[in-house]
Amino acid sequence: MTDFWNERYAQEEYAYGLQPNVFFKDAIGEIPKGKLLFPAEGEGRNAVFAAQLGYEVYAFDTSKEAKIKADKLAEEYGVTLDYNVGNLEALNYPENYFDAVILIYAHVPAEVRTEFCQHLLRLLKPNGQIIFEGFSQEQLKYTSGGPKNSEMLFSESQVKNDFPNVAFNSLSTEVISLDEGKYHQGLGSVVRFRAKKLS
């Protein structure tokens, strides 16, 4: 998969545009200033937006081309990102460190998904927040992007299983109109939630 993403992000244009994800943009204002982690952040559109607002931004992706694009975008906007290339388990982030985790279209293989999500929970401080949007299992009916493997898509019940010990402020499956660069265009089905770590 890393080769796939390196090839996509090596293109000159930004694959998913320059503007932050709408759900994330609407929700971030309720997170106090602090340390935010952006897993699978790609070309940096959401991380750069958060840095512009004054958050301390950490991000990672397995694609080196993604980091090149994210660093370029950060430089253009005059902000700094702590952006690493690698897998979550290799990056050694400290536990109970981040004030929020922002998961926007972070689709990982089914065999590692639960541990990936629970590892992220361990990195969150108590009362730390999660903002999440990803394609639902209904997305296979649509052509607006996302994995074609249903096991990499989300459902509400799956999310509840993958994120124990959180209080959901909101959790829904919605059909939305996507306009995020070349690869997220048209109607799509997404799972969205906002939650807080209990302890």
Residue ranges and their predicted role:
Residues E89-A100:
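A short acidic, Gly/Pro-enriched loop at the edge of an enzyme's catalytic core
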Residues D99-T114:
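A short SAM/SAH-binding and catalytic strip from SAM-dependent methyltransferases
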Residues N127-F135:
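Conserved beta-strand signature within the Rossmann-like core of class I S-adenosyl-L-methionine
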Residues E151-T173:
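Short alpha-helix
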